[in-house]
Regions:
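Poly-acidic low-complexity segments
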Residues: 7, 121-122
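Short Gly/Pro-enriched loop/turn and capping motifs at secondary-structure junctions
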Residues: 88-90, 111-113, 137, 144-145
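Short, charged, surface-exposed secondary-structure boundary motifs
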Residues: 114-120
Length: 159
């Protein structure tokens, strides 16, 4: 395995419960999760669900640290991996974490950050990131049936 993809998914929750909060942009109460996949879109690790009023970069380093720990505990080496993520993950603390873990970050630059230092960015490798979008679409369709009516946040990752 040479690259992993990171993205977040936001699922509307109809019956309330844990880890739910109003998101004005979605005009609903979603629940957010981050997902790490391999280059074929197979999920490697998911974050714990968080309230939907947070963006993907909320509490990013501790969240990804747990996810990387789960991957490493299953015997998969993460040093030297390329990590693709969209501009929403262009956060200095997260780039520093990737550097410390010997993970090469291939994150699109967030234009809202202003003029910042140049980072390595491989557009050809970045195209692999879209497999995580396909995985998110599948998970959203599945969760549309299951999670929308699940009120207990503990049960979300158990299915």
């Amino acid at each position: 395995m040479s690259s992993i993809q990171l993205d977040g998914t936001h699922t509307p929750v109809k019956r309330g419960g844990q880890a739910v909060a109003y998101q004005g942009r979605k005009k609903s109460k979603p629940r957010n999760m981050l997902i790490l996949t391999d280059s074929r879109g197979t999920p490697l690790a998911c974050s714990d669900p968080v309230e939907g009023n947070h963006n993907d970069a909320f509490d990013l380093v501790p969240t990804v640290e747990k996810m990387i720990g789960r991957i490493q505990s299953s015997g998969i080496a993460t040093d030297g991996l390329f990590l693709n993520a969209d501009a929403g993950f262009d956060v200095k603390d997260f780039r520093d974490y990737c550097y410390q873990q010997e993970i090469v970050d291939n994150i699109d630059q967030n234009r809202r950050n202003g003029d910042v230092e140049e980072h390595f960015f491989d557009e050809l490798l970045y195209k692999y990131r879209f497999v995580v979008e396909r995985t998110n679409a599948w998970l959203d369709a599945f969760k549309a049936v299951l999670v929308r009516f699940e009120t207990n946040a503990v049960h979300i990752g158990k299915h």
